[in-house]
Design a protein with these regions (language model features):
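Domain-length accessory/inserted modules outside core catalytic folds
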Residues: 1-136
Length: 136
């Protein structure tokens, strides 16, 4: 299985970049996007501990919605990492549709700091949606 990761820097002046890892074990067999190695999650996020949370990309104008995993710096809040507005928005897009099922402070759970990666299977449909993210 192939995976596509978008590195989302906390610094909005830096561009979002895409990275593909090929021929990996699928999630149902215990696989996933690699943590170690070249372009692994630790390298892309620039940290030693990662928390994986659900996130989504939504483009209302294009009618696109893509659910995926957001790999975040787990220690970022403790070490004063910069707020990642773009990754926080992806967390918001995931949580907003279920707002009525969440606690009133649910938006606090959208706050992401440091560099992050949005990871999805590298299917043809997902690649097309991800291209629109990179073009925006």
């Amino acid at each position: 299985m192939d995976y596509l990761a978008l590195k989302i820097p906390a610094d909005t002046a830096e561009p979002i970049t895409s990275h593909i890892q090929k021929d990996l074990t699928p999630p149902e067999e215990g696989g996933g996007y690699p943590f170690k190695g070249e372009k692994g999650a630790y390298e892309l996020c620039g940290c030693d501990m990662i928390q994986i949370v659900p996130a989504a990309y939504t483009d209302v104008k294009r009618g696109q919605h893509l659910e995926g995993d957001l790999y975040c710096d787990e220690e970022g809040l403790m070490n004063g990492s910069q707020h990642n507005w773009r990754a926080s928005q992806m967390r918001y897009w995931h949580m907003k549709p279920q707002e009525d099922q969440l606690t009133p402070d649910w938006r606090e759970w959208c706050h992401i700091v440091g560099d992050a990666c949005f990871v999805v299977p590298a299917t043809d449909d997902n690649l097309k949606i991800m291209e629109s993210i990179l073009d925006s």
